Regions:
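Solvent-exposed soluble domains appended to multi-pass membrane proteins
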Residues: 1-184
Length: 184
């Protein structure tokens, strides 16, 4: 995968480099909050820029929807490669490292979210299912082997549904930390 100017591949290299620099001889905890925008929309809706994942003829979706999803999925593929690389670099570290990844909103789905409606998504936020389809985003709490050993947890399984603003308290709970009361 080739890096572009705003690529997550460049971002994860900087994160790992900065983390190593902060940990050299310090022996203190390090907190890093990094925001990626490599795959932020809007996505091109008049053509597919790279790989074709969805084709109008085989998917039954309109061309514009296929273009939006194809361009989003290409970026998602780069992001997955970059985050996998970051996890591999963090796994090699002797220090305990816990990584939290989350999305803050759904990818752009075309004007008026037409691409989503084409795949049957309901964004009727007055209904619980529509609310979740519109607002829900995935998150991942991952730990390297050193953190698993230090914290005595495997960091496996599924977490609950909650707003990203509650990820810090969830992280504290998963790590067995108490911290300031405003983080609990």
């Amino acid at each position: 995968v080739e890096a572009q100017w705003n690529s997550d591949l460049l971002l994860v290299d900087e994160i790992a480099k900065d983390l190593r620099s902060c940990l050299d001889g310090e022996g203190r905890p390090v907190f890093s909050f990094s925001v990626s925008y490599q795959n932020h929309g809007p996505y091109e809706w008049t053509y597919t820029a790279n790989e074709t994942y969805l084709d109008p003829k085989t998917s039954g979706l309109p061309e514009e929807s296929c273009y939006v999803f194809n361009n989003y999925l290409h970026g998602a593929n780069i992001t997955i490669s970059a985050m996998t690389l970051l996890a591999q670099q963090l796994e090699e570290m002797e220090e305990p490292v816990v990584l939290v990844l989350f999305g803050d909103h759904k990818p752009w789905g075309g004007n008026s979210n037409d691409a989503y409606y084409g795949i049957g998504a309901s964004f009727d936020t007055t209904a619980l299912e529509g609310f979740y389809q519109y607002y829900a985003t995935p998150y991942l709490i991952w730990a390297n082997s050193a953190a698993k050993e230090t914290l005595g947890r495997e960091f496996r399984g599924e977490g609950g549904d909650f707003s990203p603003c509650f990820l810090m308290p969830e992280l504290f709970e998963q790590c067995g930390w108490t911290g300031p009361s405003f983080l609990q």
